[in-house]
Regions:
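Active-site recognition of the HExxH zinc-binding catalytic motif
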Residues: 1
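Non-catalytic terminal regions of proteins
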Residues: 77-170
Length: 170
């Protein structure tokens, strides 16, 4: 959540880490889409979310979308039997990530187990069966795997006698 909050911070541009806030907007779009929809491809019909990372994405996304609906800064769009989430106000969504981050920090610092349980179980476990069927149908039509992965290359440094790196090969 710290990264989500800071993805829309001008300081990242100042530090040269991103060129503009479009990077943050894309990350917000991706995070909400994944937490609300895409990760459901990994579950069978009727399953609850059990994996910790999936629960985390789900409860953060569901909480933010629920709060955002109050002032229409994220709209749920249903068109031709498909559900989409459209962020209308990225600044407000950033504020919501900040509010949730503050609450999580409070929970951690006070050891408030019941509040943590309420967030995870209230927002991160149950799956809307209609949305789930929709996601599975859409994914099946695309014929793509429900998981992505990374291949980490082995990098080998060539150094001089003082240890300075001269070259790196794969």
């Amino acid at each position: 959540m710290v990264a989500l909050y800071f993805m829309m911070d001008e300081k990242l541009i100042e530090l040269g880490l991103i060129k503009n806030l479009e990077t943050g907007r894309c990350e917000y779009d991706s995070y909400i889409r994944n937490g609300m929809l895409m990760q459901l491809r990994r579950l069978g019909i009727g399953d609850n979310i059990g994996e910790a990372h999936m629960r985390n994405r789900a409860w953060v996304s569901h909480w933010v979308v629920e709060q955002a609906a109050k002032d229409n800064c994220i709209r749920e769009i249903n068109r031709e039997g498909k559900t989409y989430y459209n962020i209308e106000d990225y600044g407000r969504v950033r504020e919501l990530f900040g509010e949730l981050l503050r609450e999580v920090q409070r929970i951690k610092s006070q050891g408030d187990y019941e509040a943590a349980k309420a967030l995870v179980e209230g927002y991160g476990v149950k799956v809307d069966p209609e949305i789930h069927k929709q996601v599975l149908s859409r994914a099946e039509a695309l014929g793509i795997a429900p998981y992505g992965g990374f291949i980490n290359p082995k990098l080998v440094a060539t150094t001089d006698t003082s240890g300075a790196i001269l070259d790196v090969t794969l």
